[in-house]
Amino acid sequence: MASEEKTEELHPFTDIFNEDETDRNCLLSKPTCFIIFGKPGAGKTTLARNIAQAWKCIRVEALSVLEEHIAAEKETGAMLQSLLVSGHSIPDELVTKLILEKIKSPEVAHFGYILTEMPSLAQDNMTSLKQIELVKNLELQPDIIINIKCSDYDLCQRTCGQRQHSTTGYVYTREQWDPEIIESRRRKKRDFPKEGKSEEEEEEEEQEEEEAFIAEMQMVAEILQHLVQRPEDYLENVEITVKLYKELLLSALEEVMAEHNPQYLIELDGNKSPEELFMTVIERLKYLNVRRAAVITKLQGTEEEMTDIIDTEELFRTVSSYKLIAPRYRWYRSKWARSCPVSLKDGNIYSGAADYTVSFLGKMYCLSSEETLKLFSLNPRPFLLPPMPLPPCKVFIFGPEHIGKTTLANLIAEHFKAKVIDYAKLVQPRFDSAREKLIKDTITEATNTAIKVVQQRLLNEKQAKQQEERTLKELQVQYSKREYNDFLSKSSEELPSLENTGSKLSSLEIGQEDKSKSETTITGDQVKDVSTEESIEEVTENHPEVFAILEDTLRHAKELNFEQPHDKQAEILEEVIKETEDNKNRFPGAPKHGGWIVENFPLVRELWLSLIEKALLPDLVVYLSDAESNGKHVLNRLYLKNKAEIDGKILERLQEEAQAKKREEEEIRKVKEEELRLEEEKQRLMELATKKSKGRHRLTTLVAHHLALPYPDYPDNEAEEEVEDSEIHEESEAQEIPEYTRGSSLPEASETSETPEGDHEPEAEFKPPGDTAVEAETEKDPKEGLGSEDLLKVMLPEFPEDGYPNVPEMEPLKEVLNNHILSWKQLEQTIMDNVVSTLTVDVSNKTPQELLQRVVETMERPFKYSAWELNAEDYEEEAEDYQAETEIDEEQEEEEEEEEEGEEKIKEKRRHMGDTKHFCPVVLKENFVLQPGNPDEAVKYREKIYYFSSTEAKEKFLEHPEDYVSQNEPLKAPPLRICLLGPHGSGKTVCARKLAENFGIFHIQFDEFLQEKMLLKAERKFGPEFEDDSEEEQLVKQELEELAAQANVKIEEDTTKKQLPDVQLTEEEEAIKLSLTDNEPLPSEILDSILSEWWLKEPIRSTGFILDGFPRHPEEAQFLGERGFFPDAAVIIQVDDQDIFDRLLPAQVQKWKTKQHKKLERKKLIKDLKTKIKEDMVAKRRAELILEREKKRREDGTFRDEDEFSDEDADYEDDIENILEEEFPKDEEEMSEEDEEQEADATERLRNELGEKFETETNNIQSIQDEFDKVLIPIIMVNGARKMHIVQYVMNMKLKPLVENRESIFEKCYPVSSHLAHKMLSYTYKHMSSFGYWDPVKLSEGETIKPVENAENPLNPVIHRHYIYFLSNKQTKEKFMMNPIKYIRQPKPKATMPVRIMIVGPPKSGKTTVAKKLASDYGLRCLSVGDALRGMLNNHPDSELSLMLNWHLHKGKTVPDELAIQALDISLMESVCNTIGVVIDGYPVTPHQMDLLEARSIIPMVIFELHVPSKEIFKRLLLEKKTEQSMSYPLHNSSQIIAYKNAKYHKNINEIRQFYQKQHQNWHVIDGFHSKWWVWNEVLKDIQQMNKYIQTYMKKIKEGKAACIDKLCITPEELIARLGEFKQFCPVSLAESNELIDCSVTSSLEFAAEFRGHYYKMSSQEKLNKFLKDPELYVPPLAPHPLPPDDLLPKRLTLSELKSRFPKCAELQGYCPVTYQDGKQRYEALVPGNIRYALEYRNCIYICESEEKLQKFMRSPMQYWNQKLPRKLPPLKESIHLTSLPLPGYLEQGTATSLIKAMNAAGNLKPKLPFLSVRRSVLLYIAFHLKAFNPKGSEYSRKKYKKKLEQFVERCELITYLSSKMTRKYKEPQFRAIDFDHKLQTFLSLKNIDPVTG
């Protein structure tokens, strides 16, 4: 449809629609960088300081960089400090290095820089050219170049007047310290006239000035004695520095500025004050729409400091009002919420502190520490750019075995590009290895210790043994000696006592000796350790004693563990995580830490505490549970995992039970068999007893013997029966079991495969074990006598497919599951105590993707914008904002208007609504219906308010708000849906049909829709207006049919109607019928089925409709609100009852008349039928009576004469008549007429009916309106009493905004003051739109001049979403606010240059009027040379130029043009001239002035010459003198002066005009004789056209495309200098057809274009369009044909050049080479050339036949140059006079062509003039034709004979016309053709007239 086609053609948004994308674009944008050029002392540093302070960029200067490094007290700073302290200067190389490092710093990467000292005059380390190349190659290249211009004289005077304070180091200018200058400034200010002030105000102002002057003089007196002049400020030093600058840097800097984009080159007048320079730069930056660096603002309140324990909600609510931008514009919450963005970038989720909260891009960010705050403040971009905020992905997954942990972990890892750490596979093996290593080391250490102990013991034993042997030997020797001596000296009696005493002494001595010897031995042993050790045997780990020592150690080695095993496990886990985090290939921008998921982590509390100590806690703990199904799914998976083992145990148990049962059954069987045997034996015995009576005693004895045997304890009979019954029952059940059960038999042990270990998920498709029947063969117990071949059939118990068998074998698994749950509950409390987020997910009936979605949502929820219900605090904030706004807005007119609306409406109007405005977003998304939300059900999301239709809708939005808001484009609005209401007869159907046609939507008439539904079945319409007629017609039809049948008459078909079918209506149809007939409301069920098709089903759903006549009742309106079928608006047509009477009553009366007429006709027809029937019946009865009489006579048998019974017959006739009258009496209708309703009564009755219906409908409409007001449906009232086309127009105008502004139906704009708008931009609270200060509305209307903001034309800022738009006036503001989407869907504004216009013309031509009009409407500077001179003298009186001007003026001389142009050039550097533009009035007027302007490169975009005749000039002068007031001095407006000026102007203007037309093609002549409005429109049209050319050129060049250079003031010299490889030949023609088309024949640039810095000229518009579309195809390297060298290019020769080539002869002996080649080199194609068409190619001369042939050769010389003549040439042609030819030849050479044309025309026309022969007629026609088309005849002659020829043809056509119109019979004049008489008279008048002269 049309709407869809329109959507496809929509232009993309100028500004990014998505707010997050806008912030991302801002973060990715390059910061604005400045560089300032200028002479030393021009003020670069001061200007840089001011710009850096205002623009928030970093000032990169040597001094500031050095001070920063020294203050940092780092290594570089210490080195710099030492150099300075030692008195050395810092090397230039080091300074340059530090500056470059500063430029590459993160701070500069965000804020940008402003550079002033590169390039520098220092050439030792690096030349100026190298410095410039260094600046050009910077990563952040300068965007804005500022050039401060100042003359050498002015700069030297200013610099040498500077003084420095000896203590503070502050530099003062002469204006600040010189008392004389201060005094002169005071005098000038005092002499300045003060207007509009009272005497008291003047006195107060003078007193204040006097006090300020005294204070300033005191300050000067204090500092004057401390001021010194620096050596560099001496005049001679300044002059040397300036000279050095001009020699070394100026030329190179000029080249840099010439290469730079002129739009971003700002030139300043250095004579202005620093404040003026700064304001000029700021205005220029504002005009250029340069992005300002986004500032970071620390949010800290003046109240008590907040603690970190404060709630997050309270924190944000409190901090958002710190440093408030304005009421209602608080700081927003970011995606990071309270998380620290710097820590999050590192992979740690730390909560930010309240004291470290900052604002950036309008949002709040909480930093966690002073260090993170510092990093964020330097450059927040790396921490905020996508993919941030992103959860670091530190996850622990817990859960029972086989619940799906591995699957979920892998899915999470895949989603977050992370790695899974399986604790059992990666950590536990390492821990086991470490433990084994510990055991091994312990055993090794114990072994070494044991070996040393054994070695030491063996050594000690050996030493002791040796010592003992030595001691024993010594004792033996001593003892033998002493014994021998004692034996000799003493007697035998004293021997025992001596022995005892000697033994004691000897033992004492021996002890002392042993002690001394042992000491000696030890000392000796220490000296001889090596020899001793070598002497003992070698001890190894296999030594028995060593093994005995290690036996206990080896016994406890397996139980050996670390002292803190959990710490060791945590340490290993830390190592694994670190290895995982070292993975650099995760994804770009990934956090430093994180990216891991741990599974199978032990549920050990001590291990978790170790993780806390190691700071290894995860961000999220996921626990997978199966609580919902009570572990059913987990047990199912565990069973499947261990199916073979469990099934085996189940089968084993079942087989044992079956065997036990079998054994029991066998025992019972044996007992029964024994009983049967005994019974049989007893029976046999009894039989024997009866047979043998002799042996009774013996039998009794035998029986008694048998009965006395010890029998087993048999069961009683009942028990036996039960056993037998149970056996039979079991056998029957066994027989009922089919042979093939649900499952398959259990495979044999050899075929069973073991299930691999590990936590792997079972496959989704598997056969439940309950469906499996297992048959097992078991051998019967031989003890029980069972055969080995008997088979026992055992089946596994059945269970659900997703369940498990409830058997005792599952109890261990259940126990394991219960133990896991208990362990988790114990660990869960520990986890929660450490504030780690825990997510418990039930896996029941959930897919892995659903589990992943749940986990991802939980992980990402902290980093998404959250929505919350509007609470009391929000309403309090809104009330505070409203109160603050009321206090601020005092004088606003809008405020006065709003006060009339009421406070609630004002609050609603100012409330910042969400992406669906006041409509419910949930209903919009789900039902595509615009349902107004309930303000009580409000939610705040991203600082915007959303209304909802119900609590359920609000809950949906709170759960997933991002699903219901716009993302990259506005939400699509449903089509227009309108309910049109009005009383019957108000014209709503006509209006609805017209509106539907205009808007392209459906028109639905509700009553007609119901009638159509009924017509399908009942084939008739229902309603009061249809019921009466139909019933009456049926009755009449029935009566007519009966009468016709009686009368035997056939009634015409058109008098009757088709018999309606008798149908059975459904309940729905009965309800519709009742609604139509009795005007009852329809039931809700029927309304729902009908309306849902229009609101919810295609094609009406997406097209829209106008619902005519619905709702009809309040109940139906209430149903619309309850069901959610909301129209956009309800249009109610208001009319009075009289209007209804005037419209409907005439038709009703006419209908009544028609009805009455038909009724009378029916009555007449019925009457006639009844009369005919009566007559037939009377005639029949009469015949019967006569027959009776005749019969009676015959019965009497008497015959009488006629005379006899005439009287009797007469009486009998009377009797018959009487009888007929009695039987057929006359109808009462015939006797008396029925009383019929008269017209007046009918009219009154109809009027009353209409009035009652109107009143009823009006009341219903009022009730409906009340219902619509309740559900907030807009009501549009339209006065329907006016003419219908006016009502339609009014209705169309009221509904048109709903259609035209449909795409902006959800958009809301908020106007703000200009001050607030700029404040928001400075804080980067809102973004400047791509339109900058362009008016989007005017831009869409074709405006090319940017509006300017001043006191007279203030801009109107408007906030739309996250951008600020500046509108030029209130009208455009209203347009934009009504449909902002329309105006932001347009191309971005093209780059503009300041408009520079000159207007020249004679005096009184209107130059100044046009110039002032341009200045007032567009803000241009209106400048004349006099204004420039006066501005120079007033603003810079001490400058060199002002001194020179005063020198000339004081001598009474005129200012020389050179000085005037210099003053004009300085004036053109003003801010307005460089931003908006300038219009120069009345300049230049002499060629010299023109040359000076050209030398200064002052080239206007366009020059307007107002051409006014001299007579008009003096006429305007006289009118001006009549109206002007008399002045005290004479004016230069006398007629003589004006005449002199006019003459002087006309004398010089031609030369000036020719110069600009030739050089710049920018001269436009305007006819000034017209009105000033006509002149203004013409000037404006030309300016707009020129602006479009320039803007298009700049846009295409910036995009790297080809652009047309027409009307760009390019001089021929510049064109030649920048021509491309093809010079002035068309590259398109050369590429496509290999033709050389020289475009230098014309100087026009209409078909010229620029591409890659070169100019190319094309031959036509078509070629230009091709080149502009694909320029790469026509220039190298893709160009197919290069341009030949100059010596191979053809050159056209003039006659003089041709003569100069003599005696060189022409090629081909002068024959035309083109004609010869095109003629296929035939003999007839040898045509001599004409010397006027000569050319030179390849140093050869060729002569062509004509200009056309010459151009052919010039285009394709290769085709024609190399030809050879044939041997036979045609003879030379001699000239013959035409008159010497014979007549046929003469005619052939002279008039053949014209004569042939005339004869062909005569042959086609076949003329025949009336009353002339054919021959004479043809001759006359040929003669007239020759005269009319004679090329040598005069224009007058040709026109004359053309008229005669046309008259001749018309007269010839008279014969054809009259022959076709005339008839043989006479026709009266009124029956003839209109022109017949005139043409006939003309025909007859030609009889005697000369056809040539007549």
UniProtKB/Swiss-Prot annotation:
This is Adenylate kinase 9. It holds the Pfam family ADK. Keywords: ATP-binding, Cell projection, Cilium, Coiled coil, Cytoplasm, Flagellum, Kinase, Nucleotide metabolism, Nucleotide-binding, Nucleus, Transferase. InterPro entries: AAA+_ATPase, Adenylat/UMP-CMP_kin, P-loop_NTPase. AMP 2 binds at Q1034, L1035, V1036, V1063, Q1064, L1065, T1066. ATP 1 binds at G41, A42, G43, K44, T45, T46. It comes from Mus musculus. Residues 198-211, 715-736, 876-903, 1223-1241 have a biased composition (Acidic residues). Residues 1424-1455 are annotated as: NMP 3. Residues 976-1187 are annotated as: Adenylate kinase 2. AMP 1 binds at E117, M118, P119, S120, R230. Residues 1108-1128 are annotated as: LID 2. Highly expressed in the testis. The keyword Repeat does not apply. AMP 3 binds at R1430, G1482, Y1483, P1484, V1485, Q1489. ATP 2 binds at G985, S986, G987, K988, T989, V990.
